């Protein structure tokens, strides 16, 4: 099937005033794309400290303006200091994610130290993974939130917080189902967190589409995202996305027209920049570099590049949506 021109879907939406159909691509040169960035894992051997500046230089060169990382650096102050300084130098916005392991005191100290550079803190990563123990996990997130809130109030820094959830299959009714019969997906997790005292400002969302998700499944999952944004009157940081075909063995990111990995990523970027651009504030592709030593086999191949010198063809797609040649 021929690839769609990247501006057709948005033209239809603007001219007709209705929703863009799932089969249409998007992007008009005279209109901005949703800001695009990447995820990085600075604890992994694929991300050595010696190449930290090269990574930030590459992001700047490709107009990838945000970098979701830091979860493994948050307690390594010298390394985080360096990352923050480099991000400032190359005009990259850091989007650190705090795991549930930090204490309130640690979160307070972090937020206070970096208040001038890090204005939005994401608290928790995919903590909606199970209903079992959710209350305990949420209580830890609330403690972290309170530490950040106290630092912000003391400094009058205006710091914001983000809560994270994943897409959820409402047709799954098995013993480990997270949202059985509930098309709103992980809304239950947001509701519980809000009730427990986590007064989050933004929501971050994770969904990795298969090419065959176009239509019903993609509408289901992105519909969950929209419902969350509307209920809580906020914006979405879509900060983990790539093709789901990688879970099934794709290692090279695919090629244009493959009706598989490459086309999956192009399709979701098209949809987000079309029907969902009103609620999605930022997108981060998972991830910048392959991690060949990762203990989980499929986690080795999510990179847009094999390494800093060898981009995959899919990087050209990402550069296009980032607005670079």
What does each model-found stretch correspond to?
Residues 97, 138-260, 297, 301-308:
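Noncatalytic carbohydrate-binding groove/subsite architecture in carbohydrate-active enzymes
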Residues 6-15:
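Bacterial N-terminal signal peptides
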